[in-house]
């Protein structure tokens, strides 16, 4: 008998689990868009230097008479190499001679120019305000915009480590509620930040709590459902996050002011925090951490809400201890992250898996965090990317079961790299083609992530699987944090970050064949089993345990 048998007695998927799952999925739906908010709140609108004669309507009317805005622009702003008005330079004084195009005058490149000492004028046709227009994060300060995204992702990295440990020590429910409140306060406050430094600090704290919320949503769903319903619960959580992306695109289209959009996704978190008081703590965690009385109380509460009062009354401490004997013994075995590197074969697997996860997450977040670089209609891109992630689950299921782990990851990582490189060199004018290639890249990146998760779980021994998942998660989050930081390289070349994303994906595809295939192979239970394995030589045991991948 095991804990899953206790759950079967109190109801494997009853009203209690459905209500719990509903609240957690809503939390995923509202939380996930906070990762992508800066696609809109930090969008860069068209801009040019503020010029007295051009942008001061009263003075320009008095001084220039009937000159059109285009004529005023011509004498005030120089042209760049593409014959478009410069965004970061202006003429030191009006160049009246440029009005007469037939007249001979010195080379335009010899005319005196200066930086935008009086600030900028922004195009408000798409975004009425963003953090870029609020704090002039353009030209010499454009790298600061990438720093805001980097700090949020760095917060996710640090938060996943800190809150992951605290969740195991103090409980999933408590940390989940604390993180909901932290995200609500910090991102609501960010909408009113008086300076850019304060805004970045608040976004770092918001990222600190975001990953913990998403992780604990999945953990609480898994720990309160029996195995046959766990994949369904996790799938619903993933679909809720995808739906959150679609809703973000729609609301951002309707709300073009960054303060309002920030509040629309932050204020509902206060309601979720208040609602989460009815969320149940994981009974499994309570029992394993030597709090069996509280665990028994939660199980009886679940039985009562599921309409199984008799089953709840039959639960006693003796029954509980008997059912949880194996789990309690397993919990006494303490593992360390250093155990992952003590033996050569496991060390090799962890290092290779870490690079694959790093490259995969860098490319994935490089795509989803920088929609504006892919095309003009960022709202449609956001909705499309959320939509293509839904069928990606089915593609991953088919690939894992028919192509295997090695082939599927290698194929889709190569395809991801090629897609990103194609986006880089497709002209901006070919918007339909850019949109199609970008959507393909997002779908493929989602497939590779799911394949990587499955492969990683099957390559690590049972005694260290959770520890290995945590370490690989750190490698993943480092890649995610570096993705926005690489956009600083656009000052040297607009294509350079995208080339790095694409090349990293291809390198990841080259690394995957160095890992053993695990399809229909027994899961290793100990480090010794991992060390005895040889690539392509281990025979599957008919009676062995293996991981079955479903469409969920």
Swiss-Prot record:
Disulfide linkage: none
Annotated membrane topology: Multi-pass membrane protein
Alphabetized GO MF terms: organic anion transmembrane transporter activity; short-chain fatty acid transmembrane transporter activity; sodium-independent organic anion transmembrane transporter activity
Ranges in the topological domain labelled Extracellular: 37-143, 199-203, 255-259, 369-377, 428-435, 490-494
Reactions it catalyzes: butanoate(out) + estrone 3-sulfate(in) = butanoate(in) + estrone 3-sulfate(out); propanoate(in) + estrone 3-sulfate(out) = propanoate(out) + estrone 3-sulfate(in); pentanoate(in) + estrone 3-sulfate(out) = pentanoate(out) + estrone 3-sulfate(in); dehydroepiandrosterone 3-sulfate(in) + butanoate(out) = dehydroepiandrosterone 3-sulfate(out) + butanoate(in)
Cytoplasmic side of membrane: 1-15, 165-177, 225-233, 281-349, 399-406, 457-468, 516-552
Main function: Sodium-independent organic anion transporter, exhibits high specificity for sulfated conjugates of xenobiotics and steroid hormones such as estrone 3-sulfate (E1S) and dehydroepiandrosterone sulfate (DHEAS). Can transport the statin pravastatin and may contribute to its disposition into the hepatocytes when the function of OATPs is compromised. It is specifically activated by 3 to 5 carbons-containing short-chain fatty acids/SCFAs, including propionate (propanoate), butyrate (butanoate) and valerate (pentanoate).
Protein name: Organic anion transporter 7
């Amino acid at each position: 008998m095991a804990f899953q048998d206790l759950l079967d007695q109190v109801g494997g998927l009853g009203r209690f689990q459905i209500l719990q799952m509903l609240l957690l999925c809503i939390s995923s739906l509202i939380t996930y868009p906070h990762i992508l908010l800066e696609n809109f709140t930090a969008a860069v609108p068209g801009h040019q230097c503020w010029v007295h004669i051009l942008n001061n309507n009263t003075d320009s009317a008095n001084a220039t008479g009937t000159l059109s805005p285009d004529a005023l622009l011509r004498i005030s702003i120089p042209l760049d190499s593409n014959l478009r008005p410069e965004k970061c330079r202006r003429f030191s004084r009006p160049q009246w001679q440029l009005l007469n195009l037939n007249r001979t005058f010195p080379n335009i490149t010899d005319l005196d120019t200066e930086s935008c000492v009086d600030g900028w004028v922004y195009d408000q046709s798409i975004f009425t305000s963003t953090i870029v227009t609020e704090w002039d994060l353009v030209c010499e300060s454009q790298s600061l915009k990438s720093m805001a995204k980097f700090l949020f992702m760095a917060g996710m990295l640090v938060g996943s480590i800190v809150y992951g440990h605290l969740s195991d020590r103090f409980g999933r429910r408590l940390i989940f509620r604390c993180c909901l409140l932290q995200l609500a306060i910090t991102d609501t406050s960010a909408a009113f930040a008086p300076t850019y430094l304060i805004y970045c600090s608040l976004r770092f704290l918001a990222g600190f709590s975001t990953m913990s919320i998403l992780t604990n949503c999945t953990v609480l769903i898994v720990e309160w459902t029996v195995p046959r319903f766990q994949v369904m619960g996790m799938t619903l959580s993933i679909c809720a996050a995808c739906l959150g992306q679609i809703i973000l695109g729609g609301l951002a289209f309707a709300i073009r002011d960054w303060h309002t959009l920030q509040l629309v996704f932050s204020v509902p978190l206060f309601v979720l925090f208040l609602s989460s008081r009815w969320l149940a703590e994981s009974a499994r965690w309570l029992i394993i951490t030597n709090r069996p009385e509280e665990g028994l109380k939660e199980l009886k509460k679940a039985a009562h809400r599921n309409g199984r009062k008799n089953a709840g009354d039959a639960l006693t401490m003796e029954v509980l201890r008997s059912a949880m004997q194996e789990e309690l013994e397993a919990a006494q075995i303490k593992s360390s992250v250093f155990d992952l590197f003590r033996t050569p074969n496991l060390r090799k697997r962890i290092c290779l898996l870490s690079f694959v996860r790093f490259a995969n997450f860098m490319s994935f977040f490089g795509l989803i965090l920088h929609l504006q670089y892919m095309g003009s209609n960022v709202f449609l891109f956001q909705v499309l990317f959320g939509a293509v992630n839904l069928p990606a689950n089915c593609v991953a299921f088919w690939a894992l079961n028919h192509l295997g782990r090695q082939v599927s990851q290698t194929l889709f990582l190569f395809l991801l790299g090629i897609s990103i490189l194609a986006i880089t060199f497709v002209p901006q004018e070919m918007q339909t083609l850019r949109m199609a290639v970008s959507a393909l890249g997002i779908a493929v990146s989602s497939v590779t992530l799911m394949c990587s998760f499955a492969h990683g779980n099957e390559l690590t021994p049972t005694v260290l699987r959770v520890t290995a998942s945590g370490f690989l998660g750190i490698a993943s989050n480092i890649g995610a944090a570096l993705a926005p930081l690489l956009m600083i390289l656009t000052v040297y070349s607009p294509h350079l970050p995208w080339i790095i994303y694409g090349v990293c994906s291809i390198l990841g595809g080259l690394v995957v064949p160095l890992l053993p295939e695990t399809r229909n192979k027994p899961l290793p239970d100990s480090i010794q089993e991992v060390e005895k394995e040889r690539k392509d030589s281990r025979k599957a045991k008919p009676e062995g345990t293996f991981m079955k991948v479903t469409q969920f």
